[in-house]
Amino acid sequence: MRIGFLGFGKSNRSLLKYLLKHQEAKFFVSEAKTLDGETKKFLEEHSVEYEEGGHTEKLLDCDVVYVSPGIKPDTSIIKLLSSRGAKLSTELQLFLDNVDPKKVVGITGTDGKSTATALMHHVLSRRGFKTFLGGNFGTPAVEALEGEYDYYVLEMSSFQLFWSERPYLSNFLVLNISEDHLDWHSSFEEYVDSKLKPAFLQTEGDLFVYNKHIERLRNLEGVRSRKIPFWTGENFATERELIVHGKKYTLPGNYPYQTRENILAVSILYMEMFNELESFLELLRDFKPLPHRMEYLGQIDGRHFYNDSKATSTHAVLGALSNFDKVVLIMCGIGKKENYSLFVEKASPKLKHLIMFGEISKELAPFVGKIPHSIVENMEEAFEKAMEVSEKGDVILLSPGGASFDMYENYAKRGEHFRELFERHGGDKV
């Protein structure tokens, strides 16, 4: 048997290491970029054939090709493989094929999925279960096959689900769906279909928890599992209360809108698993939200600073804005072909001043109209401008609305830069 790897990113690296231990086969790695010396040494030591700097027809000789999630469907090598009937799969699919689906909790959504995944892992672990945390969040799922776990909590991206043939699992949560990754997916409909793929594979004994607004995007009549929507009369959250199955519970703290949505969705899963929420609310007390997600940094001269660098879509930015009355907003990065006219219409009542830099400024600028705005060159200039146009009591919010790769290695580096500027300007930390 000959197994191919199209792209050699994090997930395919973990998959190859697993298969080298557990399967007799010949392996072939095809990577568009140049492989580093350490990677080449590893491949050569394990007699793994490879090519770099592009993909060739050698992949056609493989019985199965594992696709890295970031590979776009319209690439020439994918078109070639598909035209020849090649079997394509993913690291995620191999994992799901080798575990009890009842132990898997899959979480997806346009925004908030990392926080929800971390929260689900937190409450299960603190309850005493040996719980694996991974998927699109940190550790590739296949690494969990080397151990024994009570539960596997996985963040799932639309890319992973698109390339997985049959991602079946018993517990599935969809937080929200809005326009995103339209630079990767051929249409919004394809994006929605990818996100919801596991739901339509579930059977009557399974559980599907989802945001009610999804019913406007896709007919869910074909889903056979138990469907529980939230943001309904029975399941919703206010600033101080959680309502699950019509019963009220007091939240143990103050949370921004996005975090309340995560708490609400995860609490429903928890209720279905354990038939009570009192312990969930107690465990929630010591859950620490992830950085770069509505992270309150502190104050400078009475101005309040928030780092929301993880917000890489306009939907996420609107969610951040919903927590405030008027905001000095910093947006930057690479946009995702969203409807910026509609975004500006929805955001404008919340904006005291809009500061933009990076590629997204070119896409946003034609729509800002009479909104006070500035276009700057970089984060340093954006920070200075925010200080200049704000006054005591104002909120200064970094919520980029775009990917970071035009100027930063990732969203975390972008958020760290914003935090460094805050500290350099004498910010009083929380």
From Swiss-Prot:
Belongs to the MurCDEF family. It catalyses: UDP-N-acetyl-alpha-D-muramoyl-L-alanine + D-glutamate + ATP = UDP-N-acetyl-alpha-D-muramoyl-L-alanyl-D-glutamate + ADP + phosphate + H(+). Its EC number is 6.3.2.9. One of its GO terms (cellular component) is cytoplasm. The keyword DNA repair does not apply. This is UDP-N-acetylmuramoylalanine--D-glutamate ligase. Cell wall formation. Catalyzes the addition of glutamate to the nucleotide precursor UDP-N-acetylmuramoyl-L-alanine (UMA). Gene3D superfamilies: Mur ligase, C-terminal domain, Mur-like, catalytic domain, NAD(P)-binding Rossmann-like Domain. GO terms for biological process: cell division; cell wall organization; peptidoglycan biosynthetic process; regulation of cell shape. Pathway: Cell wall biogenesis; peptidoglycan biosynthesis.
